[in-house]
């Protein structure tokens, strides 16, 4: 992950704290200050992950909870039987560090969207995709493209303050996994959207 940050000219890579059980996660959240996100690995034998997500959301509604899993038909079947409302996003993860970087940047963009897009006028790209497997593939590539382009711009002769402003003004990425969220984000930020990326089949299906 540190190498990914370095390659993309990003500063302040996140610090990760690893625990093995839901009980350890609860204890950590109660004792450690400054945790910005919870990432949880899931397999079909897990029984506590969904109750843990609900507990965390009840205590800290604004703390992002992300589920990482190796997707298969059995995983899809198990997830369909669970209440996943407390989980912000699910991602298909196969050990690729670039996905972790994309997840961190996605939530940073979401957190800063109101100020940067609506307030300052920073542009944005809206990705509309309901397939966990597909958006888990798209996001890392999309962020790499944007961040590498930003890095190229920073090779120009700029002072430190100008570099900081240019980094901050890169296009934000917004992810919608259903039609209602996509429409809401579009209506809210349409004046600053560079474009919308979506599966045509998804749009036709949702549009009737």
Regions found by a protein language model. Name each.
Residues 1-17, 133-174:
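Two-component/phosphorelay signaling modules centered on CheY-like receiver
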Residues 51, 102, 137-140:
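Generic recognition of short, well-ordered alpha-helical segments
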Residues 56, 107, 111, 142-150, ...:
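Hydrophobic, Leu/Ile/Phe/Ala-enriched alpha-helical segments that form helix-helix packing faces
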Residues 9, 30-31, 58, 83, ...:
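Generic structural signal for beta-strand residues in well-ordered domains
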Residues 50, 63, 81, 112-115, ...:
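Short alpha-helical interface elements
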Residues 18-20, 43, 66-134, 151, ...:
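Output/docking surface of receiver
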Residues 14-34, 117-146:
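Short, solvent-exposed linear motifs at loop/edge-of-secondary-structure regions
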Residues 2, 11-13, 18-65, 69-80, ...:
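Conserved phosphotransfer microenvironments
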């Amino acid at each position: 992950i540190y190498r990914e940050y370095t390659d993309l000219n990003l500063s302040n890579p996140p610090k990760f704290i690893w625990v093995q059980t839901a009980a350890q996660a609860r204890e950590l959240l109660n004792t450690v200050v400054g945790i910005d996100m919870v990432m949880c690995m899931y397999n079909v034998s897990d029984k506590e992950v969904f109750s843990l997500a609900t507990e965390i959301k009840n205590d800290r509604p604004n703390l992002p909870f992300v589920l990482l899993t190796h997707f298969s038909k059995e995983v899809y079947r198990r997830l369909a039987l669970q209440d996943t409302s407390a989980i912000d996003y699910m991602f298909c993860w196969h050990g690729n560090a670039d996905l972790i970087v994309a997840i961190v940047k996605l939530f940073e963009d979401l957190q800063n969207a109101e100020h940067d897009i609506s307030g300052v006028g920073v542009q944005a790209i809206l990705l509309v995709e309901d397939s966990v497997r597909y958006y888990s593939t798209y996001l890392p590539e999309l962020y790499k493209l944007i961040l590498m382009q930003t890095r190229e711009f920073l090779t120009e002769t700029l002072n430190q303050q100008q570099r900081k402003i240019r980094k901050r003004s890169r296009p934000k990425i917004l992810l919608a996994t259903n039609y209602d969220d996509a429409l809401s984000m579009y209506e809210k930020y349409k004046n600053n959207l560079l474009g919308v990326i979506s599966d045509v089949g998804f749009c036709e299906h949702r549009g009737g």
